[in-house]
Amino acid sequence: MRLDSVRLSHYRNYESLELSFSEKTNVLIGENAQGKTNLLEAIYVLALAKSHRTTHDKELIQWDAETARVEGRIHKRRGSHSQEIAISSRGKKAKLNHLEQRRLSDYVGALNIVLFAPEDLHIVKGSPQIRRRFLDMEIGQVSPVYLHELSQYLKVLKQRNALLKQLSMKGGDETFLDVLTEQMITLAVKIVQRRHHFIAQLEKWARPIHEGISRGQEQLVLIYRSDTFSNDLLDVEGMTASYMQKFGKMKTNEIRRGVTLFGPHRDDFEMEVNGRNVQTYGSQGQQRTAALSLKLAEIELIHEEVGEYPLLLLDDVLSELDDHRQTHLLDTMQQKVQTILTTTSVDGIAHETIKQAKLFHVKQGAVILEETSYKEIVGEKTDE
């Protein structure tokens, strides 16, 4: 699949912008704080209906404007379609082919993307919350039903926490708590099973990629972690029984503290390299390799699940990678995916993918198609 064009209206520092992209590689060149990342973020929002940089949608709306809007034209093997996301103080509206989608789970997945940014290193070394968000966003792209189940789970969890807080302060009948617990466990089992499947598929692709980047010196393993059951107990009956047993043990403490103390909203996944936890014991180089391997594996996993390669967004990551890791990433771009990347300069990047790219210059919220060639920009001699 590819993003043919995008149009922004009152999005962050862009009052109005319309761009058409190459089906291969597109490079946004500019100094920092000019709007390069804002443009990539807008494309991310177009695809997933939420930002990867903020949880406050009002930050996406240009100052003094009422509504931010991102529109795109997407081409797939079976045809083209339009997408639109509008963000205002009243909420979000998402449209496919000009028809409003009532549920975001019906919208997400129409445009598949993989974003790789410097902060993605936090997937490896950051908090469990960051890794759970990673799982939820990526699974949601290939499994709309997962987003629906997750939404239902979070609603029940919110109700359950409110009831637990009430019971902790005032006491009362605990019958409704048992009802909410059963509902939560039913949804939790479905969510965890889908997460396990995703982790297994991601590892299948990430292991050989990681081995290649590490020149055969390292083996990457992904492990889902739950404090309720072991990874060899994944059938519905066994997981349900484990959750119910956990609830029995935690009920008194949950009521005392007024909060839910078990469930997939508290789970995590670990990355091990040669048997050692890379989050805790890995060098920065190993952590970068693990993060890059996960992102390149995402590309293959999405292709396997939906039958088309996703759009790849790279936010100033080439400067963060050494030549060896950079080459692995650029080789993938050249062979398979449409890519939109940001950088302050293409100096020192001699890969053929960049030499053949469509170049844009970004300055103060304006984007201009670069008429000069890569060779002229980096000072190489052109053929006469």
Swiss-Prot record:
CDD domains attached to this UniProt entry: ABC_RecF
Pfam families recorded: SMC_N
GO molecular function: ATP binding; single-stranded DNA binding
An annotated GO cellular component: cytoplasm
Keyword S-adenosyl-L-methionine belongs to the record: no
Record bears the keyword Cytoplasm: yes
Cellular location(s): Cytoplasm
Gene3D superfamilies: P-loop containing nucleotide triphosphate hydrolases, RecF/RecN/SMC, N-terminal domain
InterPro entries: DNA-binding_RecF, DNA-binding_RecF_CS, P-loop_NTPase, RecF/RecN/SMC_N, RecF_2
Chief subcellular location: cytoplasm
Residues that, per the record, bind ATP: G30, E31, N32, A33, Q34, G35, K36, T37
GO BP annotation list: DNA replication; DNA synthesis involved in DNA repair; double-strand break repair; SOS response
Keywords: ATP-binding, Cytoplasm, DNA damage, DNA repair, DNA replication, DNA-binding, Nucleotide-binding, SOS response
NCBIfam families xrefs: recf
Family that this chain belongs to: Belongs to the RecF family.
Function per UniProt: The RecF protein is involved in DNA metabolism; it is required for DNA replication and normal SOS inducibility. RecF binds preferentially to single-stranded, linear DNA. It also seems to bind ATP.
Name of the protein this chain belongs to: DNA replication and repair protein RecF
Naturally occurring in which organism (per UniProt): Exiguobacterium sibiricum (strain DSM 17290 / CCUG 55495 / CIP 109462 / JCM 13490 / 255-15)
Gene behind this protein: recF
